[in-house]
Curated annotation (Swiss-Prot):
This is Conotoxin reg3.11. It comes from Conus regius (Crown cone). GO terms for cellular component: extracellular region. Expressed by the venom duct. The lineage of its organism: Eukaryota, Metazoa, Spiralia, Lophotrochozoa, Mollusca. Its main location: secreted. Disulfide bonds join C32-C44, C33-C42, C38-C45. Belongs to the conotoxin M superfamily. Keywords: Disulfide bond, Secreted, Toxin. The cysteine framework is III (CC-C-C-CC). Residues 1-31, 46-47 form a propeptide.
């Protein structure tokens, strides 16, 4: 178990999480957010 091998495996598992976060951020720009999570990245609905 070499340090380089561990780093490559850790990085491989990180990439799906990063992709999910990026997808969530993109979705928030076009969808309504829950009011407690409202910020500049999402279009908030106040109805």
């Amino acid at each position: 178990d070499q340090p380089v091998e561990r780093h490559a495996e850790n990085k491989r598992h990180l990439i799906p999480a990063v992709m999910r976060a990026m997808t969530m951020n993109a979705d928030r720009r076009v969808q309504c957010c829950r009011i407690e999570f409202c910020d500049e990245d999402c279009g908030c609905c106040y109805h």
